[in-house]
Amino acid sequence: MKQQNRRVKSLNVMAQDAVRIASGWLGSRLPDRFGPADPKLDDQGQLWWVPVVLAYPGVTVGQVGEIAVSASSGEVVDHTNLADIKAAGLALGRKHRAKVRAAFLRTRNA
């Protein structure tokens, strides 16, 4: 049986780093209601795939895209198109309007 040689680059960027990088990237391009969620490392150990979620105080509405962060350099190397993220956010916001409104009311009354 042949052994597979998998080239795994050095993991210089940890999960929390990928979230921080994605958060900064999002913050400079989209409104604050879009944020990062828990990342997943790809099978080759080269990219952190960070979900982009629509979130309001007290509620995460759902995923609207993703950002790929290099596990070796920390660079954003790929992402869902910004227009697609915004469109998905609008659609999810409309679909879950009652949930979002309830979260705001809970926050305001706290």
Task: Please describe what each predicted stretch is.
Residues 1-110:
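Long, terminal "pre-/pro-" and other extracytoplasmic accessory regions
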